[in-house]
């Protein structure tokens, strides 16, 4: 299965915030022990890049992605660290184009018809309804 298929097959994609990269592998192993083989590590802390790298190197069966990616530089750093997919809170055409060009699964946050159409134009079929709460979601 490719990354998109693994994401689709997963009942849940835990969004993980790690303040210390030393906790990354233990967190990934706990998820794997519980039957979860996909995780998104947010780029909201300084430990994100090292956390992704540690999981990618130590837990090969885990599909690890980077979340809260808002710049192309973060995207590149995440992929270089071993992220297999990227999640962003909004649609950034530069990030999306780079991911498409480099065959990296990208899940941008989209809520407006304009954002959804831009994503479809880039060939994306999986989007994140975000921010859901603002638009009546849970």
Predicted features and spans:
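Conserved anion-binding
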Residues: 47, 70-73, 79-138
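Conserved N-terminal beta1-alpha1 strand-loop-helix module at the mouth
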Residues: 1-84, 101
């Amino acid at each position: 299965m490719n990354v998109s298929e693994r994401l689709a097959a997963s009942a849940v994609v835990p969004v993980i915030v790690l303040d210390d990269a030393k906790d990354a592998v233990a967190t990934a192993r706990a998820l794997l022990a519980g039957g979860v083989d996909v995780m998104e590590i947010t780029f909201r802390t300084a430990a994100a890049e090292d956390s992704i790298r540690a999981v990618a190197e130590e837990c090969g069966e885990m599909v690890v992605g980077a979340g809260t990616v808002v710049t192309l530089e973060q995207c590149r750093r995440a992929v270089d660290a071993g992220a297999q997919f990227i999640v962003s809170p909004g649609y950034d055409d530069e990030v999306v184009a780079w991911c498409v060009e480099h065959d990296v699964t990208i899940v941008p946050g989209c809520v407006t018809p304009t954002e959804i159409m831009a994503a479809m134009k880039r060939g994306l079929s999986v989007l994140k309804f975000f921010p859901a709460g603002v638009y009546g979601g849970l």
